[in-house]
Amino acid sequence: ESAISEIMKKIIREQESKIITPIDDKMFFSLLIFYSLQLFRTKKMMSKALEKIEGFILNRGDEEIVLDDSQKKTLLKCMLYITSFQFALRIEKECFAIKIYKNHTKINYITSDSPAIFYNDDSVAAMPLSPRLFVQFSLNKKIKEILPARIGFETIDIYNTEKIKRINKLIHDFSDDFLFAKKNVDLNFDF
């Protein structure tokens, strides 16, 4: 995770600069992994998984060991971590376009305790990267179709506060319990 964090910091630094820097394959996959980790390693996802799983039992020969709640949570965190990488590999095959929205308004992008957004019949994956950057992956759910050899990359400059408010409203709608903003004005969703 620390390696992914370093790559994410580099991506954010480069994308926030005035010079347009295309995302290379390593950065692309790091973005997908970061997105997937943010999607699967949330309190809500943990709770959903714990609701569905009554218990874990380890078998060693004839011996059965029932995991306690603490051990169950630790094992589940590992499972969700692995699932995150599997999901990143899946959406890597489906992704045909990446858009990075650069915010040039006085309102910042907000984030939440569940920042990864998956919507529009699971054809769009999106997430705020910083108060000034928002990433969107367009996915092709028809895996049988041939995808382009190279993923389309586009940087979109946003100067309209209404667009930022709409994105922030979307982030709000997909949040679990908490929203995080730099300023109170960032939490105003009036259009």
Regions found by a protein language model. Give the residues of each.
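Alpha-helical structural context detector biased toward long hydrophobic helices
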Residues: 1-191
